[in-house]
Swiss-Prot record:
The keyword Hydrolase applies. Keywords: Hydrolase. InterPro entries: Amidohydrolase, Bact_exopeptidase_dim_dom, Peptidase_M20, Peptidase_M20_dimer. The keyword Ubl conjugation does not apply. It is an enzyme of class 3 (hydrolase). SUPFAM superfamilies: Bacterial exopeptidase dimerisation domain (SSF55031), Zn-dependent exopeptidases (SSF53187). This is Uncharacterized hydrolase SERP0968. Its EC number is 3.-.-.-. Belongs to the peptidase M20 family. GO terms for molecular function: hydrolase activity. It comes from the Bacteria.
Length: 383
């Protein structure tokens, strides 16, 4: 089996059997069976996910990560390897990430068998990137305590960049992701006696209006921030004053000071609802993923590896606005660098974005990724 056949076989199997965050049991079994067949040792510090390891010829230890979970999306692709798990799909390309790392393990094992593996390598098949913060869970579980990891590398497919190109950026490359929720509690009454009630409808309308003002009047207009309102509801019946209200959304930013400003203003909005409408209002935050920070001292190694793999470097001027839990590795484990690998091919129809029901790509790009990884490994120098 050549490498194109390898990545096609494994990626399409994984694509047919996607599993949601923290439920990647069959995916984990598939990976461990592959590792056992190769004779590569591994650990399972969590119920799902796998950490594999090969000892090389130096004291340096480098980690490479792939996320393995899928999304609750019904696939609409008309392909013979369409998802067989109802309303679950690899709509973010993690089937490709996993397959690329499997091929890289295979290459590294071949080098190891010939005593030619240049450095120690940790292979992270990580669960729960989409929800659950699998990277942070692994770190807190002590999954890496026995490995003196010096650098962590990872990638994500990018359907907005053409095949053969890899997008890089020093410092922030993805945003932080913080969820917020407003809870309103008023007093119901019949609409004929609405003055007797305390309406969460008006209170919620005020919240919606004021959230929209935060970005315009309290944040630097030259920075890219998102305050998104994703879902809201109020009321119980057509002829009653709403006694309850709810709103939830997400905040995306690269700057911790901006995030603090947004939170402060949201607390003030909640207080104003109580004063203006006599409605109890509370806002709660759920911290998501911090910004993914690329270590500048790894940049030259990354650029050299991309060029060594005959791929094109594309410099990203502004960070992406989505969150990515790869950020925890750079924050808590070791210097890290995360890149975005182009998968767009208009002739083949590979143009739809991430988290869509039609995401697809040519498996050959996964071999490009492994070539890039191998150049990183062979030419790694201590940061």
């Amino acid at each position: 089996m050549n490498e194109l056949e390898f990545v096609t076989l494994h990626r399409r199997h994984l694509h047919q059997y996607p599993e949601l965050s923290l439920h990647e049991f069959e995916t984990t079994s598939y990976i461990t069976s592959f590792l056992e067949d190769l004779g590569v040792p591994y650990d399972r510090p969590l119920k799902t996910g796998v950490i594999a390891y090969l000892e090389g010829n130096s004291h340096h230890t480098i980690a490479f990560r792939a996320d393995i979970d899928a999304l609750p999306i019904y696939e609409e692709n008309d392909i013979d390897f369409k998802s067989k798990n109802d309303h679950v799909m690899h709509a973010c390309g993690h089937d490709g990430h996993t397959t690329a790392l499997m091929l890289f393990v295979k290459r590294c094992k071949a080098l190891y068998d010939k005593s030619e593996l240049p450095h120690n390598v940790v292979f992270i098949f990580q669960p729960a990137e989409e929800t659950g913060g699998g990277a942070n869970r692994l770190i807190k579980a002590g999954a890496f305590d026995k490995y003196p990891i010096e650098a962590v590398f990872g990638f994500h497919v990018n359907p907005f960049e053409k095949e053969g190109k890899i997008v890089i950026r020093d410092e922030e490359i993805t945003a932080s992701a913080t969820e917020y929720r407003f809870f309103l509690k008023g007093l119901s009454s019949h609409v004929a006696d609405k003055e007797q009630g305390h309406s969460c409808g008006e209170g919620l309308q005020h919240v919606l209006s004021q959230i929209g003002q935060i970005q315009q009047f309290h944040l630097n207009g030259l920075k890219r921030n998102i305050i998104h309102m994703g879902h809201f509801e109020a009321g119980e019946a057509i002829n009653t004053v709403p006694s309850h209200g709810y709103l939830e959304g997400t905040i995306r930013t690269y700057d911790t000071e901006d995030l603090a400003i947004v939170k402060h203003q949201m607390h003030k909005i909640a207080e104003s609802v109580q004063l203006l409408f006599n409605v109890e209002c509370e806002v709660k935050f759920e911290e998501g993923y911090p910004p993914t920070m690329n270590h500048p001292q790894l940049r030259q190694a990354v650029e050299n590896a991309i060029e060594g793999a005959n791929l094109e470097v594309v410099e990203k001027k502004l960070p992406f606005l989505f969150g990515e839990d790869f950020s925890f590795y750079g924050q808590q484990l070791a210097p890290s660098y995360f890149v975005f690998v182009g998968t767009q091919n208009k002739e083949k129809g590979f143009v739809t974005g991430l988290h869509t029901a039609h995401l697809n790509f040519d498996e050959k790009i996964l071999i490009d990724v492994v070539n890039y990884y191998e150049h990183l490994l062979r030419n790694y120098k201590e940061v």
